[in-house]
Amino acid sequence: MSALLQLRKATIRFGGLTAVSELDLQIAHGELVGLIGPNGAGKTTAFNLITGVYQPTGGEIVFDGKSLARSKPYRITARGIARTFQNIRLFPSLTVFDNVRAVFHLHLRGDVRHALWRGKGYHAEEQSIADRVMDLLEIFQLGKFRDEAAKNLSYGDQRRLEIVRALAARPKLLLLDEPAAGMNATEKVELTRLIQFIKDKFQISILLVEHDMKVVMGICERIVVLDYGIKIADGKPDEVRANPKVIAAYLGQEM
């Protein structure tokens, strides 16, 4: 499989602290990769590098054959990278439908004059967006909540809605930042099935940061391990589980 995303010695420093050090990471088209490590290992920082929240102080990041150097987050999203966050970031007072529609509007082809004029093209585009929003909501069993405020959904459904919003950006690569956080055992099982379904249904690559090792080991084809910003392992789940460096990093924790 060819590489969709490549980090080549990607490094970021904050003052005298090196948060991520010379990270080499590749994700192939259609691959599901886990990124794990103890608290403070640099996982979310790596996500922020990939999505343009931070700019690397060294190395480079290449996506779909083109450098992401100095790209703003919204441009990176338009290029095909979408993400979720550790803390759910929905519009709580907007309906489920409008939360997803807002993302589709980022890709609206018409300019401001086109929208103000509200001609046939505008209305056709709006109807197309509404249809696509409902298609996504139905796929993820959220259609029945279309007119419900996002804040009224259960925690698990809010997580699901956040993932739907990310998919509305039509990404080639989906970054999931601790999607199982705060979920009970039943919700985690459902999440695992959902992530595998997304990969198969939408034929996209997924990079998953997650502390729950059962989730990671159960669905990831390959796992990359960070410790203090340094990559200490990269391999199949069974290889990573048996790696002495990984065992030492997770000393006292269940693998």
Give the residues covered by each predicted segment.
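Glycine-rich phosphate-binding loops of nucleotide-dependent enzymes
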Residues: S2-M255
